[in-house]
């Protein structure tokens, strides 16, 4: 693998993890959004990654950002104007703990990709000194 290939693959990883972090941030910011303007709560988003072939190596990119398939949660709040006749309000089915774990995972992957770029640059500079 050449210098350019390793940089391109690591850069793809950085970009994918950046998008993943943005999606996680959006989910956390909307964890209490009971009405997203359409009468329904905010729907959790999830990035869908796909493998991208680059010569003889593989990288990654975000293919699309999908709405989560899990249903909404319900909480009992009869005083809420969005409550149904039984007094329940639909809320986003977002777990703050899961999102924070995903954020840590994305951060670590981002750091690993940044380290690959740093090491590739150092190896390239060392080879120029030979």
Language-model regions, residue ranges each:
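Amphipathic alpha-helical polymerization modules
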Residues: 1-130
């Amino acid at each position: 693998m050449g210098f350019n290939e390793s940089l391109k693959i690591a850069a793809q990883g950085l970009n994918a993890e950046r998008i993943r972090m943005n999606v996680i941030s959006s989910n956390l910011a909307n964890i209490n959004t009971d009405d997203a303007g359409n009468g329904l709560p905010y729907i959790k988003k999830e990035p869908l990654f796909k493998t991208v072939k680059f010569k003889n190596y593989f990288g990654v990119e975000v293919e699309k950002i999908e709405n989560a398939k899990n249903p909404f949660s319900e909480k009992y709040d009869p005083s809420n104007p969005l409550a149904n006749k039984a007094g329940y309000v639909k809320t986003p089915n977002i777990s703050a703990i899961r999102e924070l774990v995903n954020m840590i995972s994305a951060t670590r992957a981002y750091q690993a990709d940044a380290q690959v770029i740093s090491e590739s640059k150092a190896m390239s500079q060392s080879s120029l000194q030979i």
